Regions:
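Non-heme Fe(II) oxygenase catalytic core, chiefly the N-lobe of the double-stranded beta-helix
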Residues: 2-7, 11-24, 30-159
Length: 161
């Protein structure tokens, strides 16, 4: 049974979210409260401020699946980087082009109606990339596929993380 479902990681395949995240490096879940908060913060012009993270943090801490993954990262009030990205269909962005050696985590929060594509195990690969105008690095789709990273499509109709 594949753990990857359209609106979240399969609850049937995941009995321990922290162990699952440790193995796959990815966990996503549709969440209407998060979606509404993201939309509200965006409308208020505060989508990427430390204030926005504090608003989301309370609900994140109440979600047992996500809390088990994030709790060691939630001890600081201010994440290192808060960025906002819009739709950029056909582009694959990464934060790093080498396998992760530092203990860091990327938390995405999505507004209602978001569609996202992840690439399985891409965080374990070395890629060539170019600097993108949004501040991230862009990797060619052919390189990701050649690297054996299967596409995982997610639809966050209600929003999520």
């Amino acid at each position: 049974m594949s753990p990857w479902e359209l609106h979240g990681v399969s609850s049937a395949a995941v009995t321990d979210p922290l162990a699952f995240f440790g193995k796959h490096g990815l966990f996503y879940q549709e969440d209407a409260v998060i979606g509404n908060l993201v939309h509200t913060l965006d409308e208020a012009g505060k989508p990427s401020s430390p204030e926005s993270f504090r608003a989301l943090k309370k609900h994140i801490e109440e979600n047992p699946n996500i809390r088990s993954i994030l709790e060691r990262y939630l001890t600081t009030d201010n994440p290192k980087v808060c960025l906002t990205f819009g739709s950029d269909i056909g582009h694959i962005f990464v934060f790093s082009i080498t396998p992760t050696v530092a203990d860091r985590l990327v938390l995405h929060t999505w507004a209602p109606g978001s569609h996202v594509i992840f690439y399985e195990s891409s965080y374990k690969k070395d890629f060539q990339a170019v600097q993108a105008s949004n501040g991230l690095l862009e990797v060619a789709e052919a390189a990701v596929k050649k690297g054996g990273c299967n596409e995982i499509a997610a639809r966050m109709d209600k929003g999520g993380l």
